[in-house]
Each structure stands twice: as structure tokens, then as C-alpha cells.
From Swiss-Prot:
Any one GO biological process: translation
Keyword Ribonucleoprotein belongs to the record: yes
Family in the record: Belongs to the bacterial ribosomal protein bS18 family.
Induction, per UniProt: Strongly expressed during exponential growth, decreases 2-4-fold in stationary phase, part of the rpsF-ssbA-rpsR operon. The operon is induced by DNA damage by mitomycin C.
Organism of provenance: Bacillus subtilis (strain 168)
Stated name of the protein: Small ribosomal subunit protein bS18
Length: 79
């Protein structure tokens, strides 16, 4: 039988972390918050994985890049 499995649980819609918590400003110095949106390899996680909306994804990307330049976040993970 060709094709994928039918049935099962429906995927839950991801909600934006920032809009649900009322965060309007993303600070590049808040490293603990930024680490939630970076993979273990140091890559910025895409919107389809995190569920953030486009506006906050752009702000998040700028904050992560700024934190990397200020040496608050690594560019790659140290393995």
C-alpha cells in the first residue's frame, strides 16, 4: 500500500511565544530567552518549528545576530 499513515492525532497549532506572553521588545542581552530559539548546533530555528509570527521572527533574528557579535551567544556550538 502506497502512501502515508492515515488517522492519528491532528497537529496542534503553534502559537507565538511573544504575542501570548505580551512581549513587545526582544532584548539581545536576554540570552536565556534567545537560547530557546537557537538549536543545539547554534542555528536559528525557523518559524515553522518555533511558531513565532513573522514580525517577531525578524526581531528575534536581529537580536540573536547582535548577541553573537557582542559574544553573548556562540556562532556555533562547541563540540
Amino acid at each position: 500500500m502506497a502512501g502515508g499513515r492515515r488517522g492519528g492525532r491532528a497537529k496542534r497549532r503553534k502559537v507565538c511565544y511573544f504575542t501570548s506572553n505580551g512581549i513587545t521588545h526582544i532584548d539581545y542581552k536576554d540570552v536565556d530567552l534567545l537560547k530557546k530559539f537557537v538549536s543545539e548546533r547554534g542555528k536559528i530555528l525557523p518559524r515553522r518549528v518555533t511558531g513565532t509570527n513573522a514580525k517577531y521572527q525578524r526581531k528575534l533574528t536581529a537580536a540573536i545576530k547582535r548577541a553573537r557579535q557582542m559574544a553573548l551567544l556562540p556562532y556555533v556550538s562547541g563540540e
